[in-house]
């Protein structure tokens, strides 16, 4: 595919070089060769040549008009003027049909078979699909044939020559696109600003919580130290006693039981002597 595009550029340059020095019938013959040459789908540079424009006021005006149809028109445009234009070869018909598909693809990316059959004046779907496959291999467009839904889905198509009267419409379209981009950019900037504000609020809240926790720790430490000082004890020892009140109670209880045991044994010995 890429090799075809490269060869196409070389062929087009060759035709342009030959056209610079050609006039009259020789130039008209060269134009017909350009219209039939495989891979050549752009004709604006040829139309801009002064000697080519002179054909419009000569005996070869029909050839000049045919060139403009290939540059800007469609196969339907040719059929509408066929009586005043030179007949097309099969290769020229296929090329003009390829360009007609490109024109349709610029307006809609999913083109029904019915629309294509009418626009290209084809009799059946087989001819249509063969034509589209040929256009794909020529790198005129890329897409897929949806046979189930009977439509052509276009992913890419080449650009066509632009007429001077279309420049204002193109400029307007670009201006609208720029305005749309500015609106989108403004919306993005607003969202970024909101995100930054939310981030700052969360950071402030985090710092506030950390400050409150630090103050609370200081308060607890001061309160504990004051309580320990009031009882003339070491603050750490005071905290230890506060944490383990139950363990101190359990250590005193066994001593009481032991004393009770000794008392019983002593009384038993005294009772024995009296007997």
From Swiss-Prot:
List each coiled-coil range: 185-233
Q: How is it modified after translation?
A: Phosphorylated by CK2 and PKD kinases.
Keyword terms of this UniProt record: Acetylation, Coiled coil, Cytoplasm, Nucleus, Phosphoprotein, Signalosome
Comp. bias regions, Basic residues = 254-263
**Modification N-acetylserine, positions:** 2
| Family annotation (PROSITE patterns) | PCI
Segments of this protein annotated with the region Disordered: 228-275
Source domain of life is Eukaryota
Q: State the compartments where it is located.
A: Cytoplasm; Nucleus
A single GO cellular-component term from the record reads:
COP9 signalosome
The UniProt entry's GO biological process terms, in alphabetical order, are: COP9 signalosome assembly; protein deneddylation
Matching Pfam families = CSN7_HB_subdom, CSN7a_helixI, PCI
According to the entry, every stretch annotated as the PCI domain falls at 2-159
Family per record: Belongs to the CSN7/EIF3M family. CSN7 subfamily.
What quaternary arrangement does the UniProt entry report? Component of the CSN complex, composed of COPS1/GPS1, COPS2, COPS3, COPS4, COPS5, COPS6, COPS7 (COPS7A or COPS7B), COPS8 and COPS9. In the complex, it probably interacts directly with COPS1, COPS2, COPS4, COPS5, COPS6 and COPS8. Interacts with PMF1. Interacts with the translation initiation factor EIF3S6. Interacts with CK2 and PKD. Interacts directly with ID3.
State the protein's purpose.
Component of the COP9 signalosome complex (CSN), a complex involved in various cellular and developmental processes. The CSN complex is an essential regulator of the ubiquitin (Ubl) conjugation pathway by mediating the deneddylation of the cullin subunits of SCF-type E3 ligase complexes, leading to decrease the Ubl ligase activity of SCF-type complexes such as SCF, CSA or DDB2. The complex is also involved in phosphorylation of p53/TP53, JUN, I-kappa-B-alpha/NFKBIA, ITPK1 and IRF8/ICSBP, possibly via its association with CK2 and PKD kinases.
Q: What is this protein called?
A: COP9 signalosome complex subunit 7a
Q: Which gene encodes it?
A: Cops7a
């Amino acid at each position: 595919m890429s090799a075809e595009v490269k060869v196409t550029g070389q062929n087009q340059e060759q035709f342009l070089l030959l056209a610079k020095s050609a006039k009259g019938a020789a130039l008209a013959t060269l134009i017909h060769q350009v219209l039939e040459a495989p891979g050549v789908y752009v004709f604006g540079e040829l139309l801009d040549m002064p000697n080519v424009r002179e054909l419009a006021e000569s005996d070869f005006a029909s050839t000049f008009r045919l060139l403009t149809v290939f540059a800007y028109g469609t196969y339907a445009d040719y059929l509408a003027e066929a009586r005043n234009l030179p007949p097309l070869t099969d290769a020229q018909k296929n090329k003009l049909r390829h360009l007609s598909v490109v024109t349709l693809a610029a307006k809609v990316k999913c083109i029904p078979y019915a629309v294509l059959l009418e626009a290209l004046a084809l009799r059946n779907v087989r001819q249509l699909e063969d034509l589209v496959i040929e256009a794909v291999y020529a790198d005129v467009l890329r897409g897929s044939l949806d046979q189930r839904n009977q439509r052509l889905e276009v992913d890419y198509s080449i650009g066509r020559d632009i007429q001077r009267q279309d420049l204002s419409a193109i400029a307007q379209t670009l201006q609208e696109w720029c305005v749309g981009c500015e609106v989108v950019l403004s919306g993005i900037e607003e969202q970024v600003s909101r995100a930054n504000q939310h981030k700052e609020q969360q950071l402030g809240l985090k710092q506030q919580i950390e400050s409150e926790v630090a103050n609370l720790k200081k308060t607890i430490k001061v309160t504990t130290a004051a309580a320990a000082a009031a009882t003339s004890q070491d603050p750490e020892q005071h905290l230890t006693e506060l944490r383990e009140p139950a363990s101190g109670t359990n250590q005193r209880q066994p001593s009481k039981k032991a004393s009770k045991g000794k008392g019983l044994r002593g009384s038993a010995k005294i009772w024995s002597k009296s007997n």
